């Protein structure tokens, strides 16, 4: 019923090298977050023809 013996449990995680977590800048919350959201969605939009671009589009 089990795939492989329990001796192999955690093999992949054990052999992956440890990478230190890097500092990320703190995200805004509350009013400031809404402000960024508003600017992203309505203020600096580039008018495009045809299909609407998604929120995660890079082009």
From Swiss-Prot:
GO biological process: translation
UniProt entry tagged with the keyword Ribonucleoprotein: yes
UniProt-annotated stretches for the region Disordered: 1-33
Keyword annotations of the record: Ribonucleoprotein, Ribosomal protein
One GO MF term: structural constituent of ribosome
The keyword ATP-binding belongs to this UniProt entry's keyword annotation: no
GO CC, any one term: cytosolic small ribosomal subunit
Ranges of Basic and acidic residues composition bias in the record: 19-31
Misc remark: This ribosomal protein is synthesized as a C-terminal extension protein (CEP) of a ubiquitin-like protein.
Family, similarity comment: Belongs to the eukaryotic ribosomal protein eS30 family.
Protein name: Small ribosomal subunit protein eS30
Organism lineage string: Eukaryota, Metazoa, Chordata, Craniata, Vertebrata
